[in-house]
C-alpha cells in the first residue's frame, strides 16, 4: 500500500517575527512565554467548548480533534496573533495574509498565485467558531470586494495560554495608563478605552488600505476605477463620500472634523484617478 503524500507544503511551520520591529510590551512578552509552555492545539478548552456559527450562534457538529497539520498551524498562529496584539483595543494588527506569511503557512503556485488557505481555514473553521477570536470584515463599496478581515482576540483566547480575564484587564489598564502618560507629556489629552479603540481601529483600517498595492487586487481595482471615472467628478466624489461614511459609526463620524473628512475624500479620489489613468500594470518580481 502506498504511503499517503503530505497534503500540506510545510509540515513544521514556524512563526518568524518581522525584522526590525519595535520592542513588545511586557504583557506581550509574558503571553508569548506562556504560549511556549502550553500546547494550545491540545488544550482542554478545545474539547470542552463547542463550535458555534459566529453569525447564528448555532452549534456546528464536530466529530474529531484537530488533525496534526491544523494543530501545527494553530501552534504557530497563536504566538503570531499575540505578537501583533494591541492590548488596549483587542485588535490583532496584522492581516491573515501577513500572519500566514510570518508563520510559513502561505504557499505560492508555479503560476505565481499565493494561497493562505491553511491559515484562513484554521481561523474561519475553528478559532472563530470556538470563540477564541472575533472577526469583522467590511465590504469595500469603492472596489467592490471585501477588505481583509479585522481580527480581535477574546478573553477565551488568553485562557488557552493560562492567562485569566483579570490579568488581561490589569494589563489593559496598565497599557492605557502608559499611553496616556506619553500623550500628556506631549501636551495632548488622555484617552479613554473607547477612544483608544477608535485610534487603533483607524490605524488598522489605514493599514488595510495600504494593502491596496497588492498586485492580485490591482487589476480588479483598475477596472472599477476606469468605470467610475466615466462619471462626472461630482458623482465620483459622492460615491466616495458614501463609502467613507459607511466605514464609521455615527459617534465616530462626530469625532472627525470636516477638514479631515474632506482630506480623506481627496486622497481616495486622487488614488482612484491615478489608478484609472495608469497605462498598464507591472507584475510582481
Swiss-Prot record:
Family: Belongs to the IncFII RepA family.
Physiological role: This protein is essential for plasmid replication; it is involved in copy control functions.
Cleavable signal peptide: none
Keyword rRNA processing: no
GO biological process: DNA replication; plasmid maintenance
Official protein name in the record: Probable replication-associated protein repA1
Superkingdom: Bacteria
Keywords, sorted A to Z: DNA replication, Plasmid, Plasmid copy control
Organism this protein belongs to: Buchnera aphidicola subsp. Baizongia pistaciae (strain Bp)
Amino acid at each position: 500500500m502506498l504511503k499517503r503524500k503530505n497534503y500540506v507544503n510545510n509540515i513544521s511551520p514556524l512563526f518568524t517575527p518581522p525584522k526590525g520591529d519595535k520592542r513588545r510590551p511586557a504583557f506581550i512578552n509574558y503571553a508569548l512565554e506562556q504560549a511556549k509552555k502550553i500546547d494550545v492545539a491540545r488544550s482542554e478548552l478545545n474539547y470542552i467548548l463547542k463550535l458555534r456559527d459566529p453569525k447564528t450562534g448555532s452549534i456546528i457538529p464536530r466529530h474529531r480533534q484537530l488533525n496534526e497539520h491544523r494543530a501545527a498551524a494553530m501552534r504557530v498562529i497563536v504566538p503570531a496573533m499575540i505578537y501583533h496584539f494591541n492590548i488596549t483595543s483587542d485588535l490583532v494588527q496584522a492581516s491573515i495574509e501577513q500572519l500566514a506569511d510570518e508563520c510559513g503557512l502561505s504557499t505560492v503556485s508555479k503560476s505565481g498565485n499565493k494561497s493562505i488557505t491553511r491559515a484562513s481555514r484554521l481561523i474561519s473553521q475553528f478559532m472563530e467558531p470556538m470563540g477564541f477570536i472575533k472577526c469583522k470584515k467590511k465590504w469595500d463599496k469603492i472596489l467592490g470586494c471585501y477588505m481583509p478581515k479585522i481580527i480581535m482576540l477574546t478573553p477565551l483566547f488568553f485562557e488557552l495560554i493560562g492567562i485569566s480575564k483579570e490579568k488581561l484587564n490589569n494589563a489593559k489598564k496598565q497599557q492605557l495608563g502608559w499611553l496616556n502618560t506619553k500623550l500628556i507629556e506631549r501636551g495632548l489629552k488622555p484617552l479613554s478605552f473607547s477612544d483608544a479603540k477608535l485610534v487603533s481601529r483607524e490605524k488598522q483600517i489605514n493599514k488595510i488600505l495600504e494593502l491596496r498595492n497588492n498586485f492580485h487586487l490591482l487589476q480588479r481595482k483598475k477596472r472599477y476605477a476606469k468605470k467610475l471615472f466615466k462619471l462626472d467628478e461630482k458623482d465620483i466624489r459622492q460615491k466616495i463620500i458614501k463609502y467613507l461614511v459607511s466605514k464609521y459609526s455615527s459617534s465616530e463620524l462626530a469625532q472627525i472634523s470636516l477638514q479631515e473628512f474632506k482630506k480623506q475624500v481627496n486622497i481616495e479620489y486622487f488614488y482612484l484617478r491615478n489608478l484609472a489613468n495608469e497605462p498598464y500594470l507591472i507584475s510582481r518580481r
